[in-house]
Amino acid sequence: TELKLMNIGIIPTELCPSECRFCLAPWKSSVEERSGRAMGGEEFRRIAEQAVRFANDRGLIITITGGEPFLELERVLYIISKAKTRVELTTSGYWAANMRTARRVLSRVESVVKDNKSKKFSFSLQVSVDFFHQEVVSSEDGKLREAIPVKNLANLVEAMLRECSLEICLLPKYTRYEDPLVYLLAELERRGLSPRITRKFYNPNLRVSVLGDDGKFDKPALLKAYLSFDSAKKQAFLLYTAVEGIGGASILEFEYQTFKDRTAEFLEQEKGERFPLMGLEVSDDGNVYPGAHALYSWCLGNLLETTLEEIAASLEYDPLIIALAEHPWKIKNIALEAKPELRGELEKASSPLVAIYKILEDDALRLYITKELAGE
């Protein structure tokens, strides 16, 4: 099957200063575990250069995630400097503890972005703002604190709106938990940056329950919007994304009935959703994984031993990749025939994609499914 990739992710580091209980990263390790595996600067440049070149040649979006990318600022700047396509960097904003630091870091990023003269290059700084990053936790001395303070996010956003030309995108989540975006906008208003929503776009495939004068009713969920601010000439972009129940987030309850219904349909029917491979992810140790923030179930190779071109070429003939794109229910059927007891676990999945993830994270079962698909 022909690969139709949209993005390639590059992870400068999988380390993170926060310890969010609901971290989606299923591979996330402790600092002690990661320290022995992470690369030095020159080795990382070798894999980053290859990943960026792969994206440039194919016009793919480069996503820089983590961990927390700004723990390795020099690596981030190197990736941006080499890109000839769109770059989207996601940060928790932990580092913007005060306005001085926010300005200093942003000015370095802005300088490299401005120096990149490629006609097809563009850059967006995306800031996570959700209950999971802003969760209030108890510290060892018994005091309450936010995992990533809203104040830090306000410093980052204010510096970008008032003093920086970079594109900014806020990333809240569809969730039944409290939305700290409200507190962030209130803090910005106290700083003279009163927000106004200028344009809204809704997701018709996801409906949320709200209370109105006539009781409870469902409405399409907000997908994205543009925010304008008083005393600032530029806008911020707002983009809602769903919480997938993988990694630490697998302990969450269903966020919305819509997801649960889709999972039930997928388990019962011989048709439905398809999951073509949309991206590849390159970790800070050179390992390459399939998927964009979802299918980190197995490693496809290491860039110190092979190339992305070779990996991509092999994926076009991979039975699992083909099945994901054309008939993922076959993966589900083979898995349930081999392990009927797995159904109860799959019924808890927050979406059909997460159900597939739960199947493929079992190494032995994944190998068995691959052999069955190849033998058809």
PLM features per residue range, with description:
Residues 35-39, 68, 300:
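Pocket-edge positions in alpha/beta enzyme catalytic cores
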Residues 30-32, 87, 273, 296-301:
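A short local loop/turn or secondary-structure capping micro-motif enriched for an aromatic residue
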Residues 12, 66-67, 129:
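Short acidic donor-binding/metal-coordinating loop in glycosyltransferase active sites
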Residues 45-63, 72-187:
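Radical SAM/AdoMet-radical enzyme domain recognition
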Residues 163-291:
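A C-terminal junction/extension of Radical SAM enzymes
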Residues 1-46, 54, 292:
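Canonical Radical SAM [4Fe-4S] cluster-binding loop centered on the CxxxCxxC motif
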Residues 285-376:
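Flexible mid-to-C-terminal extensions adjoining Fe-S/redox cofactors in radical SAM and related proteins
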